[in-house]
Structures are given as C-alpha cells and as structure tokens.
C-alpha cells in the first residue's frame, strides 16, 4: 500500500498545506498544518518524498518551505565537507 493512503492529511482541506507567504496569517496556517503532520504515521515518508521530488511549496512531512530549504542547504554543506 502506498504511504499516501495512510496520511492523516487526506481528510483535510489541501489548501491548509499551501499557505500564501511566510508571515502573519500564513504562519498560523503553517502551524495548523504542522499539527496535522504531528498526528500522522507517515511523516517521514512524506518528507522524504517531498525532498526527493523537489516539492518547493507547501508543508510536507511536518516541515515548511523555509525549513526544507534550510535542511537541503545543511545536507549540501555536510556532503561537500565530508564527500559523502
């Protein structure tokens, strides 16, 4: 079975996970989306999928757009430093 069938967000309005902006009301929307992610049994799979498929917008796997960008930068620096 595909991990998406187990995702808690399937029963939520998809708009919740795609806030416009990253300040003011969008911050509250991001926090609400993360609350859904916190209840989800497939957060790890979701985040991995988002990173592997280049999902640049929205909340995926409990991480906002900015958080995923920061994670990608950290991973790239680690890879450059260690050669792994």
From Swiss-Prot:
GO terms for molecular function: 4 iron, 4 sulfur cluster binding; dinitrosyl-iron complex binding; DNA binding; metal ion binding; protein-disulfide reductase [NAD(P)H] activity; protein-disulfide reductase activity. Homodimer. Interacts with GlgB via an intermolecular disulfide bond. Signal peptide: none annotated. Changing residue 81 to E: Loss of 4Fe-4S cluster, loss of DNA-binding. Changing residue 73 to E: Loss of 4Fe-4S cluster, loss of DNA-binding. Belongs to the WhiB family. It comes from Mycobacterium tuberculosis (strain ATCC 25618 / H37Rv). Residues 8-70 form the 4Fe-4S Wbl-type domain. Its cofactor is [4Fe-4S] cluster. Keywords: 4Fe-4S, Cytoplasm, Disulfide bond, DNA-binding, Iron, Iron-sulfur, Metal-binding, Transcription, Transcription regulation. Can be nitrosylated by NO, 8 NO react per cluster leading to the formation of 2 dinitrosyliron thiol complexes (DNIC). These complexes are quite stable in the presence of air. One of its GO terms (cellular component) is cytoplasm. Changing residue 79 to E: Loss of 4Fe-4S cluster, loss of DNA-binding. Disruption phenotype: Essential. PROSITE patterns: 4FE4S_WBL (PS51674). Acts as a transcriptional repressor, inhibiting expression in vitro. Probably redox-responsive. The apo- but not holo-form binds to its own promoter as well as that of groEL2. Oxidized apo-form and nitrosylated holo-form also bind DNA. The apo-form has been shown to act as a protein disulfide reductase, but also not to act as a protein disulfide reductase. [4Fe-4S] cluster binds at residues 9, 37, 40, 46. Binds 1 [4Fe-4S] cluster per subunit. This cluster is stable to O(2) but very reactive to nitric oxide (NO). Following nitrosylation of the [4Fe-4S] cluster binds 1 [4Fe-8(NO)] cluster per subunit. Changing residue 13 to A: No change in 4Fe-4S cluster, binds DNA. This is Transcriptional regulator WhiB1. One of its GO terms (biological process) is cell redox homeostasis. The lineage of its organism: Bacteria, Bacillati, Actinomycetota, Actinomycetes, Mycobacteriales. Pfam families: Whib. Changing residue 58 to E: Loss of DNA-binding, still binds 4Fe-4S cluster.
């Amino acid at each position: 079975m595909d991990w998406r069938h187990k995702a808690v967000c399937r029963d939520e309005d998809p708009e919740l996970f795609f806030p416009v902006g990253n300040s003011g009301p969008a911050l509250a929307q991001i926090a609400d989306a993360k609350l859904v992610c916190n209840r989800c049994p497939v957060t790890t799979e979701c985040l991995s999928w988002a990173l592997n498929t280049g999902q640049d917008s929205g909340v995926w796997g409990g991480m906002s757009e900015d958080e995923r960008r920061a994670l990608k930068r950290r991973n790239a620096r680690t890879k450059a430093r260690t050669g792994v």
